Structure formats: structure tokens, C-alpha cells
Curated annotation (Swiss-Prot):
The active site is at residues 65, 110, 204. It is found in: Secreted. Residues 1-18 form the signal peptide. This is Snake venom serine proteinase 8. Snake venom serine protease that may act in the hemostasis system of the prey. Its main location: secreted. It comes from Crotalus adamanteus (Eastern diamondback rattlesnake). Its EC number is 3.4.21.-. Expressed by the venom gland. It is an enzyme of class 3 (hydrolase). PROSITE patterns: TRYPSIN_DOM, TRYPSIN_HIS, TRYPSIN_SER. One of its GO terms (biological process) is proteolysis. Residues 19-24 form a propeptide. One of its GO terms (cellular component) is secretory granule.
């Protein structure tokens, strides 16, 4: 089964077909408390359901399929149960989607840009991750992180984020397991060919960081997670750089690449 990586209860509410629910990082370890300073936890009411990436003091990038009503974003979070003094909570002031995104097609242009209702302050546990200066190269070592499921089948959500290293693979590797993805999709293929390391339910919207640069957004994958020859699929951030920068500059009519 193939599903977008979002929590199952939100899938029922938001999506009209079976998709992969958000997951924890499979095959990883607890992140160092200062290893995820740009990672944003997104909550609907009181429940965590997605992640995002802080790209400057006022803007967060996440997946379009993470959109929901009345959500909040928490920054500087490590343990979801034990708050720390550096945590900051923000509401979305504005949300932006690709205006040329195919309506009701969650596989098309899965990116959302969020303006916060007030700027955040950098701290020991909070710092933005800048947009990529160049696209990543196949073979790059990439870092994944999130509060998603740490077990591949049953949903086991950890209290703290897990991190793992995977490899950026050739796009051709992701075509056979995911023929439903458009051939023109602006995505990255990343994982471990033999399986065992992957993003999973609850990791949706979080970052793929390759050689220290924010290169991807957790988007799509197989269920169970971490299967051999079924890597994860990530929205390619570099292809949306111009759109993101245009929106931030005030050109809200900017369109995304086809």
C-alpha cells in the first residue's frame, strides 16, 4: 500500500483516497537536542500531525497535504510531553500554495509556505535553515528527522524526534514502485536500497537535509515503511526557490514551475 505520510485520523478528514500516513523515522535514533533547530512541530488542536522547516524568522515550509484548520506551530520542541523554556508557539498568518497546482491532486506540487503571525527569535534550540543554493547530487548523504512512527507497520509515535542518514538516489529508482507519480513531478528519491531506514507516519512536511542544505520535504512513500527498493519521495525544494522568494518579497501572484 502506498500512502502520503500523514497521521491516519487526519487522512480520513482531509484526503479522499488511501495515502501514506505521517511516520516517525524508521531505523534512526533520538536526535541530539540541538540537531533539529529548524524543525517545526505542527499541531491540530492538541495533537501533533506534521512537521515543517523554519527558513527565516517569519516563514515555514511544509507539505501542502499538511494543511488543516486551526493548527499551531511549535518551535524549539524536543520532547512533546516536557516543554522547555526555549519553545515558541506561532499561528499561521497566511498560507500559500502553488496557484497552478492541480485542484484536488495531492500528488501535484506538494508544498505549502506559511507566514507566521509574529517572528520567532533564534535561540539555543531554534534557528532557520536557508533555502538550497544548488540542487543535490545523487549519492549525497541526507539527514531525515521527525516525530513520526518508529515502527514500519503499527503506528508508534515517539515523544522525541528521531534522526537517520539516508542516500539521495537516482529518480529512476522511485519510478517502478510509484507509477502513479507524474513523470514531470519535481521530486527527489531518497532512502536505503536494502531498506531499514525511512521516513514514516507522522514525518510528513519535515525536511530532507543533504550536505547541510534544505533539499526536500517529506511527501510520499510505501507502507510498511522502510521496505527494500521502495525509497521515500520528497518534494524538491530547489525547484521552488524562485516561487518561495517571490512570495516572501510580496509577489503573492507568483506561480510555481510546471
Amino acid at each position: 500500500m502506498v500512502l502520503i505520510r500523514v497521521l491516519a485520523n487526519l487522512l480520513i478528514l482531509q484526503l479522499s483516497y488511501a495515502q501514506k500516513s505521517s511516520e516517525l523515522v524508521i531505523g534512526g535514533d533520538e536526535c541530539n537536542i540541538n540537531e533539529h533547530r529548524s524543525l517545526v512541530a505542527i499541531f491540530n488542536s492538541t495533537k501533533f500531525f506534521c512537521s515543517g522547516t523554519l527558513i527565516n524568522q517569519e516563514w515555514v515550509v511544509t507539505a501542502a497535504h499538511c494543511d488543516s484548520t486551526n493548527f499551531k506551530m511549535k518551535l524549539g520542541v524536543h520532547s512533546k510531553k516536557v516543554p522547555n523554556e526555549n519553545e515558541q508557539t506561532r499561528n499561521p498568518k497566511e498560507k500559500f500554495f502553488c496557484p497552478n497546482k492541480k485542484k484536488d491532486d495531492v500528488l501535484d506540487k506538494d508544498i505549502m509556505l506559511i507566514k507566521l503571525d509574529s517572528p520567532v527569535s533564534n535561540s539555543e534550540h531554534i534557528a532557520p535553515l536557508s533555502l538550497p543554493s544548488s540542487p543535490p547530487s545523487v549519492g549525497s548523504v541526507c539527514h531525515i528527522m521527525g516525530w513520526g512512527s518508529i515502527t514500519p507497520i503499527e503506528k508508534t509515535l515517539p515523544d522525541v524526534p528521531y534522526c537517520a542518514n539516508i542516500n539521495l538516489l537516482d529518480d529512476a529508482v522511485c519510478r517502478p514502485p510509484y507509477p502513479e507519480l507524474p513523470a514531470t513531478s519535481r521530486t527527489l528519491c531518497a532512502g536505503i536500497l536494502e531498506g531499514g531506514k525511512d521516513t514514516c507516519r507522522g514525518d510528513s512536511g519535515g525536511p530532507l537535509i543533504c550536505n547541510g542544505q534544505f533539499q526536500g520535504i517529506v511527501f510520499y512513500g510505501a507502507h510498511p515503511c522502510g521496505q527494500a527498493l521502495k525509497p521515500g519521495v520528497y518534494t524538491k525544494v530547489f525547484d521552488y526557490n524562485d516561487w518561495i522568494q517571490s512570495i516572501i518579497a510580496g509577489n503573492t501572484a507568483a506561480t510555481c514551475p510546471p
